């Protein structure tokens, strides 16, 4: 229903979306017969994402999580996929459900 992806490195989001849509990448790198598919751009960071909230270093994850939880509460239902970087080339993902 909702994708909240920390876009401090916006090129990473664009590359990931392109990879998910690519039959060749999904077949050769992920061993899938079909692509993962496209992310509905209207469901991606609908409130502007972490850059829009000021990219607070050290608190981005909490801000992204809190924002997604608030959006799900306003809708009364749904799921959100969250992804944030943790520095040093690492990242964390989570799925919220209401």
Where are the model-predicted features located?
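Claisen-condensing/thiolase-fold acyl-transfer catalytic domains that form or cleave C-C bonds
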Residues: 1-98
């Amino acid at each position: 229903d909702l994708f909240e992806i920390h876009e401090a490195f916006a090129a990473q989001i664009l590359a990931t979306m392109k990879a998910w849509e690519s039959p060749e990448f999904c077949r050769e790198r992920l061993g899938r017969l079909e692509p993962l598919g496209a992310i509905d751009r209207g469901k991606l960071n609908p409130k502007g994402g972490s850059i829009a909230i000021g990219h607070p270093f050290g608190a981005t994850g909490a801000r992204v999580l809190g924002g997604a939880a608030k959006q799900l509460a306003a809708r009364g239902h749904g799921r959100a996929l969250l992804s944030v970087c943790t520095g040093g080339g690492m990242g964390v993902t989570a799925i919220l459900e209401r």
